[in-house]
């Protein structure tokens, strides 16, 4: 968390504070891709080239075919669409080593810096 704290382009997608706690089965960040020279898809590709597999966080329900056919429209949910376009799920698992965590963090920070 401290590596992305107060970053101008990267934000934590989920803030845990007070009496709340998390199992941390996912680690999510939000990146303002409008401030970068590369798209989210290109960002994914660059991470993959560095052997970091990230994922699109959950696709909003109205974007699923079934709900689209029912008339749900993402234009009515601009915040959900923005969150979807900015949020990445990063590797997080029990045996993740500190060195691997550091590599993921440094790679993300470097990619953002190179593409501002």
Model regions and ranges:
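PLP-dependent aminotransferase class I/II
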Residues: 1-116
């Amino acid at each position: 968390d401290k590596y992305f704290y107060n970053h101008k382009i990267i934000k934590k997608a989920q803030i845990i504070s007070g009496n709340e706690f998390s199992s941390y089965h996912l680690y999510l960040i939000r990146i303002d891709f409008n401030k970068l020279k590369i798209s989210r898809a290109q960002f994914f590709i660059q991470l993959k080239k560095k052997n970091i597999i990230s994922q699109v966080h959950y696709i909003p329900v109205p974007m699923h075919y079934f709900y689209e056919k029912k008339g749900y429209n993402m234009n009515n949910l601009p915040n959900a669409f923005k969150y979807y376009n900015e949020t990445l799920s990063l590797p997080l698992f029990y045996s993740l080593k500190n060195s691997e965590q550091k590599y993921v963090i440094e790679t993300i920070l470097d990619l953002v810096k190179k593409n501002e």
